[in-house]
Curated annotation (Swiss-Prot):
Name listed for the protein in its UniProt record: Polymerase basic protein 2
Origin organism lineage: Viruses, Riboviria, Orthornavirae, Negarnaviricota, Polyploviricotina
Keyword 4Fe-4S among record annotations: no
InterPro entries: Flu_PB2_2nd, Flu_PB2_6th, Flu_PB2_C, Flu_PB2_CAP-bd, Flu_PB2_middle, Flu_PB2_N, INV_PB2, PB2_helical
Subcellular location: Virion; Host nucleus
A Pfam family reported for this protein in Swiss-Prot or TrEMBL: Flu_PB2_4th
GO BP annotations, alphabetical order: 7-methylguanosine mRNA capping; cap snatching; DNA-templated transcription; symbiont-mediated suppression of host gene expression; symbiont-mediated suppression of host mRNA transcription via inhibition of RNA polymerase II activity; viral RNA genome replication
Residues under site feature: Avian adaptation: E627
Single annotated GO MF: RNA binding
Role summary: Plays an essential role in transcription initiation and cap-stealing mechanism, in which cellular capped pre-mRNAs are used to generate primers for viral transcription. Recognizes and binds the 7-methylguanosine-containing cap of the target pre-RNA which is subsequently cleaved after 10-13 nucleotides by the viral protein PA. Plays a role in the initiation of the viral genome replication and modulates the activity of the ribonucleoprotein (RNP) complex.
Gene name for this UniProt entry: PB2
GO CC annotation: host cell nucleus; virion component
Main localization of the protein described in the UniProt heading: virion
The protein's assembly and partners: Influenza RNA polymerase is composed of three subunits: PB1, PB2 and PA. Interacts (via N-terminus) with PB1 (via C-terminus). Interacts with nucleoprotein NP (via N-terminus).
Family from the record: Belongs to the influenza viruses PB2 family.
Length: 759
């Protein structure tokens, strides 16, 4: 106070004011401080001081030709005096106003294209809806979030190459544009930015915003997709939140969401196949999301979700070192443990073999709706501090932590037998057995856990076995906190291995992920997911299996046809026919298959009975292991639309309808494709398939000796003729082609010639 009084007294004397405002600053230290280096030391002051001058701006000399000396009001726009130390002109701020009003205009066509991300943001905000503001405690946890809506997912290096190619195409330096997305973007941007006058550096900067994902580690309480993060400052404070619905979606959020759905579907489907890992890879490689190959997205997209990480591990990509249990991501923050097998008895006296972690460890647990800090020793929970959105979410976290602790009182709380199985009907491992058991009903677990009196700690509160809050007592070692636990911030990725049952381990052999951890939540994808793999046909139900099977046959008819006549067994074993079997009534599968195979054999033997449409129609039925029976069928049943529907062996039905006029096939009313050849021609009769590489010349000609069997033909030299016995004892004259013919000789010609030769 004394000092302030003294200063007040000084300031009241006019001499003090004069000294402070008028005298020059000539203290060397001060002059040095403000003049050394190029960096402005006090930009705000400098700006104020400059703008107080008449001509604070310098410009190139050319400005004198482009701007008049005075404006309409007669104010001077530039001074004839040169800027000290350069040959530039001193200009007034009024010149900027004049230029903005009267200066040359330029085409604005490129602005929305270059500043695309900004224009789109404005649109999203314009159409967004802001709801009421609520005042309440915000449990924010730091998560790694995407702060840049509307971007592609190129790596920094890939983006750099694209930007160089688009903005500085003539610069020297090797640029490798390999990925599909790189090439597409480059082509698109070059077209968009032809004759663009915007400064190349600005264009490059804006392109980077469009191409690369930028993430930050931010405290978030609500939605984490990028369209919510861009308005984070408007939607959540320390003690308030504002409801907000984005006015539009962006491709990157849609990709993340659709990728998770595709990965979950694929992992679930792979789990039940004979070789889960091989199936998973086959599906990842043949799936497209929004028209982009899933494997390309997996390589670029940093989304961390259990199913996505399993797919990445299968592809040999690095993933986060944290592990997953009960839908929570665990990250060990201190301590260490060794694993040891131990046998324990449940409350039902069932023996479980569990792998016990021996040693003191601390973990952070992060889930979608709850987070926690867990401290544990060997088979003992020391402390659990939980925070969550609601009672239910907190309970979920507590159950997972209790099971993870492997405490004896938890194992003794099991009532009844543990026999949970996964989708492939295999027993779950003991830890997941326990988890499933208590997720179904945790009453006994909470009752048996024990309670303790608690101290009054700021921001902490107790929780009772019935999940109600309390300030006096709490479940032993467990407290509920107002503060969330931050997600693990590191983006470090580690090398992992995956076994054929899709269990992912780090290099020490710890299991990080397994299919049991993949969420069963079903969602609707934002982008179209195209599963080309036949394993995924059943995802959309029986109708989809039916349509897809027939579409596949038609698409591959050329090769199917040859296999049908030469190597049917191999054809019947194709995996594309597997899903179809689930539509055929179990009891009838073998009989149908035997019947169809016999029918096909007759077609191969009897000339002219070959019928493309019928082969296509009946082929999927032949894939089941056949039963030898004399049974004949006029229709075959498939289970779709909740009941049995009939496919007629001869003729059309609502299930399978071939239109001769349009040559198109409809299956259950859906178009399944067109047959490119004329089915009436007995298409490529078997004969021409068998006689590949031979030209049919006409009827038998005795001069060329006795009729050979089809097998003996292989001995003919090129250009040599011979009689050959085909079908039901008909003999025709053939010549071995002089050049090797394509896989399918013009089949219709061949069939016609056989007919002519015989008739």
């Amino acid at each position: 106070m004394e000092r302030i009084k003294e200063l007040r007294d000084l300031m009241s004397q006019s001499r003090t004011r004069e000294i402070l405002t008028k005298t020059t600053v000539d203290h060397m230290a001060i002059i040095k401080k403000y003049t050394s280096g190029r960096q402005e030391k006090n930009p705000a002051l400098r700006m104020k001081w400059m703008m107080a001058m008449k001509y604070p701006i310098t410009a190139d000399k050319r400005i004198m030709e482009m701007i008049p000396e005075r404006n309409e009001q007669g104010q001077t726009l530039w001074s004839k005096t040169n800027d000290a130390g350069s040959d530039r002109v001193m200009v007034s701020p009024l010149a900027v106003t004049w230029w903005n009003r009267n200066g040359p205009t330029t085409s604005t066509v490129h602005y929305p294209k270059v500043y695309k991300t900004y224009f789109e943001k404005v649109e999203r905000l314009k159409h967004g809806t802001f709801g009421p503001v609520h005042f309440r405690n915000q449990v924010k946890i730091r998560r790694r979030v995407d702060i840049n809506p509307g971007h592609a997912d190129l790596s920094a290096k890939e983006a750099q190459d694209v930007i160089m190619e688009v903005v500085f195409p003539n610069e020297v330096g090797a640029r490798i544009l390999t990925s599909e997305s790189q090439l597409t973007i480059t082509k698109e941007k070059k077209e968009e930015l032809q004759d663009c006058k915007i400064a190349p550096l600005m264009v490059a900067y804006m392109l980077e915003r469009e191409l690369v994902r930028k993430t930050r580690f931010l405290p978030v309480a609500g939605g984490t997709s990028s369209v919510y993060i861009e308005v984070l400052h408007l939607t959540q404070g320390t003690c308030w939140e504002q409801m907000y619905t984005p006015g539009g979606e962006v491709k990157n959020d849609d990709v993340d969401q659709s990728l998770i759905i595709a990965a979950r579907n694929i992992v679930r489907r792979a789990t039940v196949s004979a070789d889960p890992l091989a199936s998973l890879l086959e599906m990842c490689h043949s799936t497209q999301i929004g028209g982009i190959r899933m494997v390309d997205i997996l390589r670029q997209n940093p989304t961390e979700e259990q199913a996505v990480d399993i797919c990445k591990a299968a592809m040999g990509l690095r993933i986060s070192s944290s592990f997953s249990f009960g839908g929570f991501t665990f990250k060990r923050t201190s301590g260490s443990s060794v694993k040891r097998e131990e046998e324990v008895l449940t409350g039902n006296l069932q023996t479980l073999k569990i792998r016990v972690n021996e040693g003191y460890e601390e973990f952070t647990m992060v889930g979608r709706r709850a987070t926690a800090i867990l401290r544990k020793a060997t088979r003992r929970l020391i402390q659990l501090i939980v925070s969550g959105r609601d009672e239910q979410s907190i309970a979920e976290a507590i159950i997972v932590a209790m099971v993870f602790s492997q405490e004896d009182c938890m194992i003794k709380a099991v009532r009844g037998d543990l026999n949970f199985v996964n989708r492939a009907n295999q027993r779950l491992n003991p830890m997941h057995q326990l988890l499933r058991h208590f997720q179904k009903d945790a009453k006994v677990l909470f009752q048996n856990w024990g309670i303790e009196p608690i101290d009054n700690v700021m921001g902490m509160i107790g929780i009772m076995p019935d999940m109600t809050p309390s300030t006096e007592m709490s479940l032993r070692g467990i407290r509920v906190s107002k503060m969330g636990v931050d997600e693990y911030s590191s983006t470090e990725r580690v090398v992992v291995s995956i076994d054929r049952f899709l269990r992912v381990r780090d290099q020490r052999g710890n299991v990080l992920l397994s299919p049991e951890e993949v969420s069963e939540t079903q969602g609707t994808e934002k982008l179209t997911i195209t599963y080309s793999s036949s394993m995924m046909w059943e995802i959309n139900g029986p109708e989809s299996v039916l349509v897809n099977t027939y579409q596949w046959i038609i698409r591959n008819w050329e090769t199917v046809k040859i296999q049908w006549s030469q190597d049917p067994t191999m054809l019947y074993n194709k995996m594309e026919f597997e899903p179809f079997q689930s539509l055929v009534p179990k009891a009838a599968r073998g009989q149908y298959s035997g019947f169809v195979r016999t029918l096909f054999q007759q077609m191969r033997d009897v000339l002219g009975t070959f019928d493309t449409v019928q082969i296509i129609k009946l082929l999927p039925f032949a894939a089941a292991p056949p039963e030898q029976s004399r049974m004949q069928f006029s229709s075959l049943t498939v289970n779709v639309r909740g009941s049995g529907m009939r496919i007629l062996v001869r003729g059309n039905s609502p299930v399978f309808n071939y239109n001769k006029a349009t040559k198109r096939l409809t299956v259950l009313g859906k178009d399944a494709g067109a047959l490119t050849e004329d089915p009436d021609e007995g298409t490529a009769g078997v004969e021409s398939a068998v006689l590949r590489g031979f030209l049919i010349l006409g009827k038998e000609d005795k001069r060329y000796g006795p009729a050979l069997s089809i097998n003996e033909l292989s001995n003919l030299a090129k250009g040599e003729k011979a009689n050959v016995l085909i079908g039901q004892g008909d003999v025709v004259l053939v010549m071995k082609r002089k050049r090797d013919s394509s896989i399918l000789t013009d089949s219709q010609t061949a069939t016609k010639r056989i007919r002519m030769a015989i008739n």
